[in-house]
A protein has these predicted regions:
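Transmembrane alpha-helices and adjacent helix-loop boundaries
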Residues: 1-257
Length: 257
């Protein structure tokens, strides 16, 4: 089968409503699942800091389970196995006037639970990178643990967390393709539906690959801006022109200091 450039350019530059719906749903699922993952990761990371084993052990088990099993298995298990076992079934719900299908709910929760395990380790590493003297200073000021984290530790840890956080969202965008197995009409399943009607497989899969490349590129640019924004306070001040030319001590002598 020859590659049809007309079909390729048509769906790339003038995407159908099915494509636009899948693209929108991919972005919505990614953002909501990432927000859930960050919230779970923060809670899990703070519990890991506790010296109480009753708080640490459940979190350790959660991180071990989510990171040690395939994401595809987690998605299928959450949506189908729980329903088949009579434990829980995702039903359609109405939220703010919109009907949210059960498979979309399961997709967001499954992706969020998986992401929370990875974010827990990222946030824990970011908190561990903060100098221990900051903790002692906060305790000397009489700060509670919550206030110490909110005012001193987490703002500094966020500078360390931003780069891997951006990478995790990049992965999340591509992981949304896995939820097509439970019937969520994201970008990949939308492409499969159009492919079954047009029989132009290579052209349409190349289009969806370029769409994902566009999404990850735009996010990469935004991530770079975030890293620059939160890394400004860690950068040393640029030296003066005379200091660069003559050296720091020579410049002081020229000014009579």
């Amino acid at each position: 089968m020859n590659f049809n450039w007309d079909v390729f350019w048509q769906y790339l530059l003038q995407p159908s409503g099915v494509y636009l719906t899948g693209l929108w749903l991919t972005c919505v699922i990614s953002v909501l699942a990432m927000a859930m993952g960050c919230a779970l990761g923060l809670a899990a990371a703070l519990l890991r800091l506790s010296r109480n084993p009753l708080l640490q052990l459940p979190v350790r088990f959660y991180v071990w389970l989510m990171r040690g099993t395939p994401l595809l298995v987690q998605i299928v298990f959450l949506y189908t196995a729980l329903a088949a076992g009579g434990i829980f079934r995702f039903e359609d719900v109405q939220l703010f006037g919109l009907v949210v299908p059960g498979n979309i709910q399961a997709a967001i929760i499954a992706l969020g639970l998986n992401e929370g395990a990875y974010m827990a380790e990222i946030i824990r590493a970011g908190i561990g990178a903060v100098d221990k003297g900051q903790y002692e200073a906060g305790r000397c000021l009489g700060m509670t643990f919550a206030k110490l984290m909110r005012r001193i530790v987490l703002p500094q840890a966020f500078r360390v967390i931003v780069p891997p956080l951006g990478n995790e969202f990049n992965v999340m965008l591509k992981n949304t393709t896995l939820v097509s197995v439970i019937g969520v009409q994201e970008l990949l399943l939308s492409t499969q539906m159009v492919t079954s009607a047009t029989f132009r497989v290579f052209e349409l899969y190349l289009v969806v690959a370029l769409y994902f490349l566009l999404l990850t590129t735009l996010w990469g640019l935004f991530q770079r801006c975030l890293e620059k924004r939160f890394g400004q306070s860690d950068r040393p001040a640029p030296p003066a022109a005379g200091s660069r030319m003559f050296g720091r001590h020579t410049f002081k002598l020229l000014r009579g200091r």
